[in-house]
Amino acid sequence: MTEFTLSDLEKIVATRARAAPEESWTAKLVAAGQKKAAKKLGEEAVETVIAAIGDDRKNLVDESADLLYHLMVVLNIAAIPLQDVMSELARRTSQSGLQEKANRQNP
């Protein structure tokens, strides 16, 4: 079992985002801007769904890794720390999913 975390990935993305675009895919994606990065995130999301439907475990693992990586890039460009997302998840999971959804729909 690996000890690699999403926090580790966030740090790697932040470091690589500061590199020269010709030296790093992450830097190239960041330099292209949020619209390009978000489009790539959407493509990876679709590929993850297709892998899930296809019942191909290895492909689903691979596409999920791509999806998480591209999410970290999008969050980096938006200057949203992973901790903000984790805090929101913690808040949402402190109650049932149905109650949380009702609260969002009726603030």
UniProtKB/Swiss-Prot annotation:
GO BP terms: L-histidine biosynthetic process
Pathway noted in the entry: Amino-acid biosynthesis; L-histidine biosynthesis; L-histidine from 5-phospho-alpha-D-ribose 1-diphosphate: step 2/9
GO cellular component term, pick one: cytoplasm
Catalytic activity field: 1-(5-phospho-beta-D-ribosyl)-ATP + H2O = 1-(5-phospho-beta-D-ribosyl)-5'-AMP + diphosphate + H(+)
Alphabetical list of Pfam families matching this protein: PRA-PH
SUPFAM superfamilies linked to this entry: all-alpha NTP pyrophosphatases
Enzyme class of the recorded protein, top EC level: hydrolase
Annotated compartments: Cytoplasm
EC number(s) given by UniProt: 3.6.1.31
Keywords: Amino-acid biosynthesis, ATP-binding, Cytoplasm, Histidine biosynthesis, Hydrolase, Nucleotide-binding
CDD domains: NTP-PPase_HisIE_like
Molecular function per GO: ATP binding; phosphoribosyl-ATP diphosphatase activity
PANTHER family referenced in this protein's UniProt entry, alphabetically: HISTIDINE BIOSYNTHESIS BIFUNCTIONAL PROTEIN, HISTIDINE BIOSYNTHESIS BIFUNCTIONAL PROTEIN HIS7
Assigned protein family: Belongs to the PRA-PH family.
UniProt-recorded name of the protein: Phosphoribosyl-ATP pyrophosphatase
Gene name of this polypeptide: hisE
